[in-house]
Amino acid sequence: MTFARIAGTGSYLPDNIVTNRDLEQKVETSDQWIRERTGIEQRHIALPGQSTVDLAEQAALNAIEAAGIEATDIDLIVFATTTPDKVFPSCACILQARLGIQGCPAFDIQAVCSGFVYALATAEKFIRTGSSKKALVIGAEVFSRILNWEDRTTCVLFGDGAGAVVLEASEETGILSTHLHADGRYEELLHVPCGIANDFDAVKAGQAFVEMKGNEVFKVAVNTLGRIVDETLEANQMQKSEIDWLVPHQANLRIIAATARKLDMPMDQVVVTVNRHGNTSAASIPLALDEAVRDGRIQRGQVVLLEAFGGGFTWGSALLRY
């Protein structure tokens, strides 16, 4: 049987760091308020002129190097983002050209904070069916460009960054299962209420901002992530104790802790970066995964659960043996 196995990970964060103290100077908030409700202490914000693909390129190069391959060995690019450089072509195509790759399929996926899990699941299917041998999967965002920096309920939450993995076809066990879901009835609880075909004038005026009803999102997220943990374990006939690491979407420390409790997992088996990165949307899971791989926490052969919840609502999980 052919599995899709992670051969290498990579990530990149902009140099510019914005702390909670910095935000105290911009909006009516406080470091204590932000920490107590979200766990966030700082976030990285892209510099003017720094784009989503700029961040993704560095993460991709790091992942390719870690995998021990050449960029031209890549035969599929799946790019998860909500903040593309252009309406078209896709970020995947722009990145493909920068990496000197020609001819392979390259496309974007938009599932907001669940985007990386969606992209990983898609690439895994290509590999399982023999349509790809080495896939580059990316989650990258410049979410700071769609934030209203006068809205204290949203501007304190998000950051910019990029993460990537190289998936390769292997006889060794890799991704064990993926689980994807969505429910569009919750559209307006977390959205940007304008776009290309709807209120484009607001976009042109630079007024395309994230709007969120945080309390409602929190309630649905906690319940939904609890259910997908059960679904993932049941699909693999696994016990909670068999999972070595949880790498969750980094939205809010309270949501992360609730998922860990669902797994009866101590927090030292949970990869947490939200305190330093904020919510980087589709980039958060690959950023956290790369950090834990590079610092030696996640080892080959260990079982890792990835899970995410985002606008749409969308949610998903991936269980893998690293």
Swiss-Prot record:
Gene3D superfamilies the UniProt entry points to: 3.40.47.10
Pfam families, per database record: ACP_syn_III, ACP_syn_III_C
Molecular function via GO: 3-oxoacyl-[acyl-carrier-protein] synthase activity; beta-ketoacyl-acyl-carrier-protein synthase III activity
Segments for region (ACP-binding): 250-254
Keywords: Acyltransferase, Cytoplasm, Fatty acid biosynthesis, Fatty acid metabolism, Lipid biosynthesis, Lipid metabolism, Multifunctional enzyme, Transferase
Catalytic residue list: C113, H249, N279
InterPro entries xrefs: ACP_syn_III_C, ACP_syn_III_N, FabH, Thiolase-like
Localization (cell): Cytoplasm
Catalyzed reactions: malonyl-[ACP] + acetyl-CoA + H(+) = 3-oxobutanoyl-[ACP] + CO2 + CoA
Top-level lineage group: Bacteria
Family under the similarity heading: Belongs to the thiolase-like superfamily. FabH family.
Subunit description: Homodimer.
Pathway(s) it belongs to: Lipid metabolism; fatty acid biosynthesis
Free-text comment about domains: The last Arg residue of the ACP-binding site is essential for the weak association between ACP/AcpP and FabH.
EC number: 2.3.1.180
Protein name: Beta-ketoacyl-[acyl-carrier-protein] synthase III
One BP annotation, GO: fatty acid biosynthetic process
Any one Gene Ontology cellular component term annotated for this protein: cytoplasm
Described purpose of this protein according to its UniProt entry: Catalyzes the condensation reaction of fatty acid synthesis by the addition to an acyl acceptor of two carbons from malonyl-ACP. Catalyzes the first condensation reaction which initiates fatty acid synthesis and may therefore play a role in governing the total rate of fatty acid production. Possesses both acetoacetyl-ACP synthase and acetyl transacylase activities. Its substrate specificity determines the biosynthesis of branched-chain and/or straight-chain of fatty acids.
Coiled-coil regions, chain positions: none
